[in-house]
């Protein structure tokens, strides 16, 4: 049985409002359309992946999202923005942000019940995948940012991880308290 790990945070904004935040690696949420960047395991006609498998994975992921029931959820390993929108259709999550490199099979997303006031993408230099997504929120006159990232795997080398870490540190350094 696969165990789903989600890290849930609750933050207090100016000690007045409570906002719950989670992060969830959906572990390759793909549709059944070939856009050319899929992993081989998710190519229809080449693997066991088909529309039925894609719909089943979408429904199971939607159940986890609904069970989390947080205000904001950062998501990793989503194929495209259309899959992200399908995931939250008919839900309380009305706002989505997404980033993906053209050559990457998966991207990062954020879904929210709160309307973001902006977003920014940080490209990790010399790494073909794994942008860092920053989504900005404002509530009760206070701004806060959520950074969504998914560092390269260790098998790709520690240097790629260090580049991602440096990019995130630089982005965080630009934040005002």
Per-segment meaning from a language model:
Residues 78-143, 151:
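Structured beta-strand-rich core segments of catalytic domains in phosphoester-bond hydrolases
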Residues 46-52, 69-75, 98, 121-122, ...:
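Second-shell loop/turn segments in exported
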Residues 15-90:
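N-terminal, active-site-proximal structural segment of metallo-dependent hydrolase catalytic domains
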Residues 32-35, 85-87, 121-123, 147, ...:
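Short, solvent-exposed loop/turn and secondary-structure capping segments
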Residues 133-177:
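Extracytoplasmic, non-cytosolic globular domains
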Residues 53-57, 125-129, 160-164:
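Phosphate/oxyanion-binding active-site loops and adjacent basic polyanion-contact surfaces
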Residues 17-20, 68-72, 92-95, 117, ...:
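Loop/turn elements at helix/coil->beta-strand transitions in domains of secreted/extracellular proteins
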Residues 3-15:
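Sec-dependent N-terminal signal peptides
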């Amino acid at each position: 049985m696969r165990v789903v790990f989600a890290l849930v945070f609750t933050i207090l904004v100016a000690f007045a409002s409570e906002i719950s935040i989670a992060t969830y690696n959906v572990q390759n949420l793909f549709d059944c359309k070939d856009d050319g960047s899929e992993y081989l395991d998710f190519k229809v006609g080449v693997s066991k992946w088909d529309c039925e498998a894609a719909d089943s994975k979408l429904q199971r992921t939607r159940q986890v999202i609904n069970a989390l029931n947080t205000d904001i959820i950062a998501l990793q390993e989503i194929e495209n923005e259309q899959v992200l929108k399908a995931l939250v259709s008919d839900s309380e999550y009305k706002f989505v942000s997404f980033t993906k490199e053209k050559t990457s099979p998966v991207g990062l997303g954020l879904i929210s019940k709160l309307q973001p006031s902006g977003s920014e993408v940080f490209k990790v230099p010399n790494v073909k995948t794994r942008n860092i997504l920053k989504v900005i929120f404002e509530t009760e006159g206070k701004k806060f940012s959520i950074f969504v990232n998914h560092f390269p795997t260790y098998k790709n080398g520690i240097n790629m991880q260090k580049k991602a870490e440096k990019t995130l540190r630089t982005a965080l350094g630009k934040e005002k308290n």
